[in-house]
Amino acid sequence: MGIQPSPVLLASLGVGLLTLLGLALGTYLVRRSRRPQVTLQDPDEKYLLRLLDKTTVSHNTRRFRFALPTAHHILGLPVGKHVYLSARIDGSLVIRPYTPVTSDEDQGYVDLVIKVYLKGVHPKFPEGGKMSQYLDSLKIGDMVEFRGPSGLLSYAGKGNFNIQPNKKSPPELRVAKKLGMIAGGTGITPMLQLIRAILKVPEDPTQCFLLFANQTERDIILREDLEELQAQYPNRFKLWFTLDSPPEDWTYSKGFVTADMIQEHLPAPAEDVLLLLCGPPPMVQLACHPNLDKLGYSQKMRFTY
């Protein structure tokens, strides 16, 4: 007849097992409670966010801070994606895409840097920008509709880009060791999002090259952020500017984006090179693409936001 374990021993083992299970469950629940909650749960849903703060960045640019549902929420926006803001303005529904300058490391709020296009300033756009003027008119506490994540590109890290040819197509993997970027005006925001995401990871080998076009020196938004990153990561991030109307002491390029500028300041065409474009349609269609064609960049090497 075998030795039977005593009831006391069995009870002790049971208590010990329950204690371990309780500790494991407690640890899981604590970790789960500390995990930030995601705001953008469904890309087809609209989320009302409250305006927290509005600050002046430059003569025509504002930084808008919106509150997320709680102080422990993150926006939930993958790198490379953007959001849509929608509002009914003068009886019409207006929808515009924006890329935040904050990331999912920031909890409780999301920041947008937006250039305000006022009425009567630009002869080609006498009414100005509907959405930017609407946002500028908001009072602290007003609500705005956000929707996302949206976009055909996302960054998975270490040079891995998932790019959809169109909305209905599955993403295709594109691996780049060198990332060239041409931005115009507020087209800098998706570029800055990517640059920050790449540079903050020491193991990410991707090199970034940015050509940033603006009309005047005071139109350069987020310049301090860019120059700080360049100084901090001189071997991983190269920065160059061009202005339509530069001051006399300007040491960068002058005029529209040219083939020479691209050749001098961006990586040459290669299988491991990806070029991203974001800016006013005339700049992208009339200055960038024809010059990229001339220099031998294939369509596979380019992505236009």
Curated annotation (Swiss-Prot):
Per UniProt, subcellular location reads as: Membrane
Please tell me where this protein is predominantly located.
Answer: membrane
The way it spans or sits in the membrane comes to: Single-pass membrane protein
The text of the family note is:
Belongs to the flavoprotein pyridine nucleotide cytochrome reductase family.
Please give the cofactor(s) recorded in the UniProt entry for this protein.
FAD
EC number, as in UniProt = 1.6.2.2
Q: Which GO terms describe its biological process?
A: sterol biosynthetic process
Q: Known Pfam families for this protein? A: FAD_binding_6 (PF00970), NAD_binding_1 (PF00175)
Q: What class of enzyme is it?
A: oxidoreductase
In this chain, FAD is annotated as bound at: 136-166, 175-210
Q: What keywords are annotated for this sequence in UniProt? A: FAD, Flavoprotein, Lipid biosynthesis, Lipid metabolism, Membrane, NAD, Oxidoreductase, Steroid biosynthesis, Steroid metabolism, Sterol biosynthesis, Sterol metabolism, Transmembrane, Transmembrane helix
GO cellular component terms attached to this protein's record = cytosol; endoplasmic reticulum membrane; mitochondrion
Which parts pass through the membrane?
8-28
Name this polypeptide is given: NADH-cytochrome b5 reductase 1
Write out the function statement from the record.
NADH-cytochrome b5 reductases are involved in desaturation and elongation of fatty acids, cholesterol biosynthesis, drug metabolism, and, in erythrocyte, methemoglobin reduction.
